[in-house]
Regions:
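Structural preference for beta-strand elements that scaffold enzyme active sites
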Residues: 137-141, 181-185, 223-227, 254-258, ...
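N-terminal low-complexity, Pro/Thr-rich disordered segments
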Residues: 28-33, 39-99, 155, 362-366
Length: 366
């Protein structure tokens, strides 16, 4: 199936770093998150803009690249990692006198991006993020990406060695979150790969079972919201073909589904597609990855458009103020500046690529 879907590899090499309490109303607001976080202290688009232009012309007060991390995230409930690759790159360029480049890259370093915990032991990465978020009363976004037979053997192939290893991993993942407020994006690609036939039929039953069990386990954490991945509008073009696979995987017991992870589809395209899919799933809510969709997808051959496409831009900054009652959040799930794979001169999937990160930042208006 290598020629059919706009593939999007994820973290191959990051050991990682990457919540909204399920007691919140389904439409997430920053105020609601903040209130919930206060209770739990024991432990990108301008906010309010419902339809940013495909050109990435969104802006808010945090778009000023000279702002500090604290200022840049004041209107967002999400945690910004002060030790991210982007933050370290900014520091290095400042020392080297590359002031303009450092200023541009703050468009990434001062935004909240998802954490992809390690595949061998997720607990240290999660614990570090939860501690950091608690200090600032913030929510962390995590990605659980370790399903057996992941990615059909392509750039991000791998995953847990077997079903029990995955159950153990998810149990450790959930336990490390504890009572902290968290969003978990569950297994990018896993359900679409069932729907498009890329995952061999002999693995289907096990995958449906594991995804459903993962949702159940994660939802035992009182502050965790779970969104089961549903691909992007340019993959399974007919949302009706995804509805039953998502139901079999347990989406009705999750908080909704996620769209556009690591892809470049515009907000409008994702919202239109998500609204159709939501209608087939009892008005399920969803999130949209806006990390790199400021210019939309690369025109031309879609089979070539998924991997480090040139001329792209950062999208709507992470926010819960989406202007759409079905869209719970715009999130940066793909970490901008990390390679999609060894194409167009890029390093291996998941490796930090400063030049590409700078290109995304410079193309972003505002």
């Amino acid at each position: 199936m290598s020629g059919r879907k706009p593939h999007h590899p994820h973290h191959l090499y990051r050991a990682s770093r990457t919540p909204l309490p399920r007691s919140l109303p389904r439409s997430l607001t920053a105020a609601a998150v903040a209130a919930t976080v206060l209770v739990l202290t024991a432990t990108g688009c301008s906010p309010g803009s419902s339809s940013p232009s495909p050109s990435g012309s969104h802006r808010d007060s945090a778009e000023r690249t000279g702002d500090s991390v604290a200022e840049a995230t004041a209107a967002s409930p999400f945690w910004v990692d002060p030790a991210s690759d982007a933050a370290r790159q900014v520091e290095q360029w400042e020392k080297e006198g590359r002031k303009d480049d450092a200023k541009a890259l703050r468009r990434i370093s001062e935004r909240a991006v998802a954490e992809w915990p390690a595949w061998d032991n997720p607990a240290p990465d999660i614990s570090r993020a939860v501690r950091g978020a608690a200090a600032g009363k913030r929510t962390v976004v995590f990605v659980a990406y370790n399903i057996p037979h992941r990615d059909c053997g392509r750039y991000s192939a791998g995953g847990a060695s077997d079903a029990q290893a995955y159950r153990d991993w998810i149990n450790d993942f959930a336990g490390a979150i504890g009572k902290a407020p968290a969003i978990v994006i569950l297994e990018p690609d896993a359900v679409p790969h069932l729907a498009d036939g890329c995952t061999p039929a002999e693995h289907h039953h096990e995958r449906y079972e594991l995804l459903s069990q993962a949702i159940t386990r994660l939802k035992q954490q009182p502050g965790t919201r779970v969104y089961l991945d549903a691909g992007n509008p340019d993959w399974i073009s007919d949302p009706a073909k995804l509805a039953e696979p998502l139901r079999r995987a347990g989406v009705n017991t999750a908080d909704g589904f996620s769209l556009n992870v690591s892809n470049f589809q515009t907000n409008n395209a994702a919202k239109a597609y998500g609204t159709q899919l939501s209608g087939l799933l009892g008005d399920a809510h969803f999130t949209i990855d806006t990390s790199r969709n400021g210019q939309g997808p690369l025109p031309g051959d879609r089979d070539e458009a998924w991997c480090n496409p040139p001329g792209r831009a950062l999208g709507t900054p992470p926010t819960t103020k989406t202007g759409n009652e079905l869209v719970d959040a715009f999130l940066w799930i793909k970490r901008p500046g990390e390679s999609d794979g060894p194409c167009r001169g890029g390093p291996a999937a998941g490796r930090w690529w400063p030049d590409y990160a700078l290109g995304l930042a410079r193309k972003t208006k505002g």
